[in-house]
Curated annotation (Swiss-Prot):
One of its GO terms (molecular function) is orotidine-5'-phosphate decarboxylase activity. Substrate binds at residues 12, 34, 61-70, 116, 177, 186, 206-207. Its EC number is 4.1.1.23. The active site is at K63. The gene is pyrF. It catalyses: orotidine 5'-phosphate + H(+) = UMP + CO2. It comes from Sinorhizobium medicae (strain WSM419) (Ensifer medicae). Pathway: Pyrimidine metabolism; UMP biosynthesis via de novo pathway; UMP from orotate: step 2/2. This is Orotidine 5'-phosphate decarboxylase. Catalyzes the decarboxylation of orotidine 5'-monophosphate (OMP) to uridine 5'-monophosphate (UMP). Belongs to the OMP decarboxylase family. Type 1 subfamily.
Length: 232
């Protein structure tokens, strides 16, 4: 895969108009976009369909979690949207039902392990007797066993996760920040080059591109860093 196949621009924006403006500005430079809750509930689901129909790849970041049948029925309808990736929380029964519902389609199901905004204290406060990396690795094992298409985790855990899941599953890493960029609300971050070196297959970059004075120039700089890392 080239850098352009691996870069996912996060459209974490409040309005459809802002998202459309970013996609227009990035043009053919960016092939892959992430749509999460914020945009999804502001017309983003129809926008996801339109992007997919136009030839772009779409990562629908819905982090599904519900009873088995509800998850399965939701996945069946999401398959019809033509998007490329969908997230679920890494709970075994939900993952297994989703895998069955997506069987035979091109939808890559991604297991969310531990949010990159969480540190060790956050994990403990949530009631887990694990440090973040141990919880990530446990959930990665469960996702692999369930037949999921990939894992979402921070680049800090990417190398350890890759050892567990092998080379075939996607490893999608949010919390990517170019050198010198502010972390924002992310606590476990890494540069694009370091994330690729750690085993990430896809990098999600939001604010460093969409909030940049020149989003196209920002995307090109990140793609150049990724290409350099991939060729090195």
């Amino acid at each position: 895969m080239s850098a352009r196949d691996r870069l996912i621009v996060g459209l974490d924006l409040p309005t459809l108009a802002e998202a459309e403006k970013i996609v227009s500005a990035l043009g053919e430079e960016v092939l892959f976009y992430k749509i999460g809750y914020q945009l999804a509930f502001a017309g983003g689901l129809d926008f996801a369909r339109d992007l997919a129909a136009s030839g772009k790849q779409v990562f629908l970041d819905m982090k599904l979690l519900d009873i088995d049948n509800t998850v399965a029925k939701g996945v069946e309808n999401i398959v019809k949207m033509g998007v490329s990736m969908l997230t679920l929380h890494a709970y075994p029964k939900a993952m297994k039902s989703a895998v069955e519902a997506a069987r035979g389609s091109n939808l890559c199901l991604l297991a969310v392990t531990v949010l990159t905004s969480m540190d060790e204290q956050d994990v403990m406060d949530a009631g887990y007797n694990y440090d973040p990396q141990s919880l990530v690795l446990r959930r990665a094992e469960q996702a692999h066993a369930a037949g999921m298409g990939g894992i979402v985790c921070s680049a800090a855990e990417a190398a350890a996760v890759r050892k567990i899941i092998g080379g075939d599953m996607a490893l999608v890493t949010p919390g990517i920040r170019p050198a010198g960029a502010e972390k924002g609300d992310q606590k476990r971050v890494m540069t694009p080059a370091d994330a690729l070196a750690a085993g990430s297959s896809h990098l999600v970059v939001g604010r460093p591109i969409v909030a940049a004075p020149d989003p196209l120039a920002a995307s090109r700089a990140i793609l150049a860093e990724m290409e350099s890392a991939l060729s090195g």
